[in-house]
Amino acid sequence: MLDVAIIGCGVVGAAAAYELSHYPLHVAVLEAENDVADGTTKANSAILHAGYDPETGTQMARLNVQGVALAKKICARLDVPYRQCGSLVLALSQAELPHLQKLYANGVANGVPGIRLLTAEETLAMEPQLAPTVAGALFAPSAAIVSPWEFALAMAEVAVRNGVELYRSTPVTNIEKIDGGWQLTTPNGSFAARYVVNAAGLNAQAIHEMAAPHTFTLEPTRGEYYLLDKSEGNRVNHVIFQCPNENGKGVLVAPTVHGNLLVGPNAQPVAGDDTACTADGLAFVAAAARRSVPGIRFGESIRNFAGVRANVDTGDFVIGEADGAPGFIDLAGMKSPGLSSAPAVAKEVTKILAAHNDLPEPKTNYKDGRTRVRFKELPPEQKAELIAKNPAYGRVICRCETITEGEILDALQSEIPAVSIDGVKRRCNAGMGRCQGGFCGPRVLELISKTLGIDPLDVLQDKAGTNVLLCETKTGRGCNHG
C-alpha cells in the first residue's frame, strides 16, 4: 500500500510530490495526461504574485506570501527560469486611486514586503511606455515572472529522482474507502493508499465527489492571451496590472523569462476544459491592454492561446481533509494565485500528515538540485568543450531559439522524458520562437521517433489524439482517415 497517492501533476501536484519526497514515504503521482504540467500550469500568466490582492485572513493571502518566497528559493535550487521584476498596479484615473489605497492596506496586512504607492511621475519614470493618463501605481517588488511548466517539471523530476513514482496517462476513474486507506481505480490498474491528495485541477471537484459529499463547486474560467515576439519583449520591465475587479486581476502586460511579451487574460466562464481562442475575446484583451500600454504592436503576435483556471464558489482555496473522508486531502480551487502559492500549499499536506503522527523524520540522503544545458547562454569556450564531448550540441535544430540536438535529446532522456513535440518544447524551448516550430518541428518529430523507438505516425503534438502525421504519401502505405 502506498503511503500517499497524489492525483494530478500540475504545479500543485508536483509541489506536493517534491515536498513529500523529502521524507521516507512511498508516494505515487497519478496523472491523467501523458505529461506533467499539461493543464492550467502550461497556460497561465506565469506570474508569482506578491500577495496584496487576496482578502486578509484567507488561505490565499497566507499561502501566496509564503509561496512566492519559497518559489524563489526552489527556482534557484532547481535551475528554473525566474526573474524578480516586481509588479505595478495602475490607477488609470484619479477615481481609481482609492482602490490602490485599499490594495496597499491589504498588502501590508498580508505581510507583503516592500510595497509602496507611487505618484504618476514616479510610475512613468519606471515605465515610460505606460499610458500618459496614469494617475499612480502600487509597486510590489517581490512579484516575479517564472516558467510555470519548467517549475512544475523541475519539482516533479527531483521528486522522481528521490523515489516518487509517476504514472502518466493514468486517470483516476473511481475511489473507494478500504481498511486503512483508499482504493483508486485507473485504466492501468488499482492503487491502494493510506492518504490521497486531490490535486486534480479542473477535475478536482469530480475527484472529491468520488470520495466525499459535495462541498464546493468549481467554475471553469477561460483566459485568452497574446504571446508577442521578442521584438516587443522590452516594452515593459515590470508586470503591469490594472485595478482588479470581480473577474480577477484583469488584463496584464508582462515580460516573460524567455524574452517575449505576454498580454492577457480575459475571464470567460466555460464548460470544462474549453481552451479555444475567440475573435471577440482576443479583441477585448488587445483593447484592454492598450489602456495600460498603448504602444503594443499586436502585429508582432507569434501565438494566441487560452488556459482554463479553476475558480471556485468558496472564494478561497479548498485545502484540508474532506468532511467524512479522513485521509482524503483536497488541494482544490487553485485559481490565481495558485502558481504563486503552490510550494506553500504543498507544506499544508505535510502538516496534515504530521497532525496524524504519520510524518517521519526527513531523509538524510536527499538528492536535491538540478541543472540543464542552455547552449545559447554558454560562453564560447564552454560551447566548444560541450561540442567536443558530444557533437549533438553542435547541431542547431531550432534556429529561432538556438536549441541544439543535444538539448532535445536531453529532453527525451531526462528523469521524466518528453513524449510529444510540445513536451520537448516545454523542456528545452525548441519550437517556442517566432516560427512556432514551422522550421524545427519535422526534425523534432524525427528525433522523437528515433530516440523513443516509435513510428513517426504515432508521434504526438501534445495530448493523446494529436498525431501530427496521418499517413505516408509516397511509400504506398496510404491514408485510412476519412
Regions found by a protein language model. Name each.
Residues 15, 175-180, 184-264, 268-278, ...:
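Flavin-dependent oxidoreductases
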Residues 2-28:
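N-terminal Rossmann-like FAD-binding beta1-loop-alpha1 element of flavoenzymes
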Residues 46-126, 135, 250-251:
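Dinucleotide-binding Rossmann-like beta1-alpha1 core, especially the glycine-rich loop
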Residues 248, 257-258, 273-396, 403-416, ...:
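C-terminal catalytic lobe of FAD-dependent flavoproteins
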Residues 62-65, 90-99, 138-157, 275-280, ...:
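Short beta-strand to alpha-helix junction loop
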Residues 22-42:
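Glycine-rich FAD pyrophosphate-binding loop
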Residues 404-414, 438-456:
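Iron-sulfur (Fe-S) cluster-binding segments and ferredoxin-like electron-carrier domains
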Residues 138-195:
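Helical element adjacent to the flavin cofactor pocket in flavoenzyme catalytic cores
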